[in-house]
Structures are given as C-alpha cells and as structure tokens.
Amino acid sequence: MEAIAKHDFSATADDELSFRKTQILKILNMEDDSNWYRAELDGKEGLIPSNYIEMKNHDWYYGRITRADAEKLLSNKHEGAFLIRISESSPGDFSLSVKCPDGVQHFKVLRDAQSKFFLWVVKFNSLNELVEYHRTASVSRSQDVKLRDMIPEEMLVQALYDFVPQESGELDFRRGDVITVTDRSDENWWNGEIGNRKGIFPATYVTPYHS
C-alpha cells in the first residue's frame, strides 16, 4: 500500500525512517503496532508514525478480511473481480483473492529482499503497480484471468458488540445491528449509517453481514 506524508518527520532512532510532507511512502507492515508502521522510501526501510501519514484509498484493499469471507464476497461477482487482503497465515504479508472461471483463487503476494512485490516473475515497487499490471496481464498461469474492479456496492456489516460513543460524530449501535458502510478509507474507523443516523465507528466491532 502507499501513503502520503501529511507532515515532516525526523527520525530519532536508528530503526525510524525520516520523510518530508507530501512524499509517497510504501507501507510494508501495519500489523505489529497500530501507532508505528514499517515503510520504505527511496530504498530505505524504517518505522514511521501512523498519524503522520494518510493512506491512499483503494476500493480493492480490504485489510484484515478472512480468506473465507473473501470467497463469500467474490463468489457471486464477475470474472476478474478481486481484492487484496492481509494474509491470515503470514501477518504483514498480503494475499490477492480473485474470481476465476472455476471459483475464487488466492495468490500469495511475494516480496523479495528489496521489498519488491510479485506474483510470478515481473516485480513491482508497490501493490498499486502490481494491480495495474495485472489488469492487462493474467494473474493465473493456467487460465487467462485479468483483474477487474468489483462493481461498487454498499457494504453491509453486523455489529459484534455494543458500541457507546465517546465523542461526537460516532455512531451508536447494539450487538446485532446491521450497518451500511459508506467509507472505509481509514483502517481503524469506518463511516456508516443506520437508518437516518450517521457516524464513525471502530472497524473491529463489526463483521461482514450475510443475510
């Protein structure tokens, strides 16, 4: 994933990475610490404060969705429909789930010593570049399957727990409530609505809704 720096940051430790406002950083790992992400800039890797950046929003990035939920989501979609998610078996890595003619297939996104991403031979500086390339080149070696965006649709989720707002602008709900997600560009806090009530809520409090 890629992110845009919102502020300048000067490293104060050897494992941190300095950057300037508006620079584009490649995010390598968001899982170990929600406050510090591992990133790369100009061939250098290090930790960066997550509140100093803004993730570039992509509809195909679903974050911590399970393999099973990815299959449910893609099973009735058109051929080539896809999403990228955080790997369940290897946290910090990514998987590409794609609707193929014979069902949903999952491809592990590999990474070399230079942190370049690849599925087969051609390597890329970012997930964004990998996705764009495979819009015109098959992701599969056994059949011709090119990536195509899912037709946009509202995402429904169901509350796993009660949520009582602590700040204005947050959405109150009870366990079992069904919420329409209107924006999930932030990994931790999503925008949603229940009836005519709108607000933000913690993404960890909900699960994909299956009627």
Swiss-Prot record:
Signal peptide: none annotated. The keyword Acetylation does not apply. Disruption phenotype: Embryonically lethal. Loss in Johnston's organ causes scolopidium abnormalities. It holds the Pfam family SH3_1. Keywords: Membrane, Repeat, SH2 domain, SH3 domain, Synapse, Transducer. The keyword Kinase does not apply. GO terms for cellular component: COP9 signalosome; cytoplasm; nucleoplasm; plasma membrane; presynapse; protein-containing complex. Its main location: membrane. Changing T22G: Increases the stability of the SH3 1 domain. Adapter protein which modulates signaling mediated by several receptor tyrosine kinases such as sev and Ack. Required for proper signaling by sevenless. May act to stimulate the ability of Sos to catalyze Ras1 activation by linking sevenless and Sos in a signaling complex. Required for functional and morphological integrities of the scolopidia, sensory neurons and the antennal mechanosensory and motor center (AMMC) brain neuropil. Required for Ack-dependent suppression of apoptosis in the eye. This is Growth factor receptor-bound protein 2. It comes from Drosophila melanogaster. InterPro entries: Grb2-like (IPR043539), SH2 (IPR000980), SH2_dom_sf (IPR036860), SH3-like_dom_sf (IPR036028), SH3_domain (IPR001452). It is found in: Membrane; Synapse. Found mainly in the developing eye and in the antennal disk. Also observed in other imaginal disks tested and in the embryo. Expressed in Johnston's organ, the hearing organ, neurons (at protein level). Interacts with autophosphorylated sev via SH2 domain and Sos, Dos and Dab via SH3 domains. Binds to tyrosine phosphorylated Dab via the SH2 domain. Interacts with phosphorylated Ack. GO terms for biological process: associative learning; epidermal growth factor receptor signaling pathway; epithelial cell migration, open tracheal system; fibroblast growth factor receptor signaling pathway; follicle cell of egg chamber development; imaginal disc-derived wing morphogenesis; insulin receptor signaling pathway; olfactory learning.
